[in-house]
Amino acid sequence: YFAERNKGAYHNLFMTFSGNPQFVELKGNTITEKIKFISRANWQMNTDLEKALLKILDVAIENHCSQEEMPKSLIIISDMEIDRCTSQNHRENFYDYVSRVYEEHGYKIPNVVFWNVNSRHDVFLADKNRKGVQLVSGQSASTFKNLIGCVDKTPVEMMYEVLNSERYQAIQI
């Protein structure tokens, strides 16, 4: 779904998450063919989020993308069994480091969404004040809608936006 809506150099690309994430071009004419194709991708069941974010930047640099052509969000649909976000040792937080690298190349880092689709874990990989990182859990259409509408907010800002939405106006305390 997301890959098909990407623009420019990112159109029809999805990323495998592993110690060495790769972009893969989505193939197939039907939803069944696409799901089968995605399931055959090289999923190593671990995540180096730093490399994933830098891979997005590499595509932008190689294709001379404008900021408007860049993905607005990196949506990590996961069971949250993420081992760690980086294999590097930086003096600064990996997210701050990657943000700085993006800025050095004239880009803004994409919003990062950790979408926990397995409720057996309550582990999230960001603090409540990290702007540009959202934490969501669940598999409903309303989760998807809220996720798309909260780009570039902190987890707390996103929570308040959801709780203050029309859906919850009927709740009185």
What are these regions (language model features)?
Residues Y1-I173:
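Acidic, glycine-rich A-domain
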